[in-house]
A protein has these predicted regions:
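ABC family nucleotide-binding domain
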Residues: 1-202
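H-loop (His-switch) and adjacent beta-strand-loop-beta switch element
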Residues: 199-212
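ABC ATPase nucleotide-binding domains
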Residues: 214-217
């Protein structure tokens, strides 16, 4: 609500994202991309319409059910790395598995495998202050992957990184996509969106353009 007027952040959005797509969602401030990310990530529910994820109608789930979906189906990567400062890379990656009740031996094995996927096998026992910005984001990506989510949802994941490190991180996402991971990227940077094989442009709460890029070929 804005005064007595209802403002709809998204209007008439009809969108299907297929398994193993690498999709970038773009748009200026106020375009609705953050709202769309919150809906896709089950952080919010739509005021009307439906959202289906893996044949499940999640738009009608309660908060507890949405929390279970988020933990099981969605891996989040944010602009800020959100790592525990006193914990090692390995322990930071283990955290979602601790919440899921996974035993310690399996936790360590899966966290180590996840760090290996992002090229940090030699940094497992380092703390965040011993890592570069790019390495910290790799830890965050490994943490997002450790529950083997259906979707990797990245919100401005290179926003705190320089251009060279940003491209290194985007190559990690590209490699994960080529290995079969579905990736949804929220960004306002064209050079970052160019790594995706599909670009969705939002404007004033509507899909303005939805295009496949050359990278999809």
């Amino acid at each position: 609500m804005l005064g007595t007027e209802t403002v709809h952040a998204l209007r008439g959005v009809d969108l299907q994202i297929r398994r193993n797509e690498f999709t970038a969602i773009m748009g200026p401030s106020g375009s609705g991309k953050s709202t769309l990310m919150n809906l896709l990530g089950c952080l919010d529910t739509p005021s009307s319409g439906e959202y289906w994820l893996n044949a499940q109608k999640v738009s009608e789930l309660n908060d507890d059910e949405l929390a279970r979906i988020r933990n099981k189906e969605i891996g989040f990567v944010f602009q800020t790395f959100n790592l525990l400062p006193r914990a090692t890379s390995l322990h930071n990656v283990e955290l979602p598995l601790i919440y899921a009740g996974v035993g310690s031996k399996e936790r360590r094995e899966r966290a180590a495998q996840s760090l290996e996927k992002v090229g940090l096998a030699d940094r497992m026992h380092h703390r965040p202050n011993e890592l570069s910005g790019g390495q910290r984001q790799r830890v965050a990506i490994a943490r997002a992957l450790v529950n083997q989510p259906s979707i990797l949802l990245a919100d401005e994941p290179t926003g705190n990184l320089d251009s060279a490190t940003s491209h290194e991180i985007m190559q990690v996402f590209t490699d994960l996509h080529r290995a079969g991971q579905t990736v949804i990227l929220i960004t306002h940077e064209r050079d970052i969106a160019a790594f995706a094989n599909r670009q969705i442009h939002l404007l004033d709460g509507k899909i303005e353009r939805d295009v496949l890029t050359e990278r999809a070929a």
